[in-house]
Amino acid sequence: MIVTTILFPEKNEKKIELQENSTALDMLKNLDLNPDVMLVIRNEVPIPVDEKLEDKDVLKIVRVVSGG
């Protein structure tokens, strides 16, 4: 399956091929991104990393930053 990812705040868009039944975690690993500091959004709703993805999904990936 092919999914489109958009990494924020850079707005880098990339199409990647994943195996069927891949999860958001699989996608993050494929992109070499740390799942502990990333939020995956599909259809304007955050999804858990164990959520299965579907062909032609468009996923926004946001780096979670905290400070003090």
Map each language-model feature to its residues.
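Ubiquitin-like/PB1-type beta-grasp interaction modules and other compact soluble beta-rich domains
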Residues: 1-67
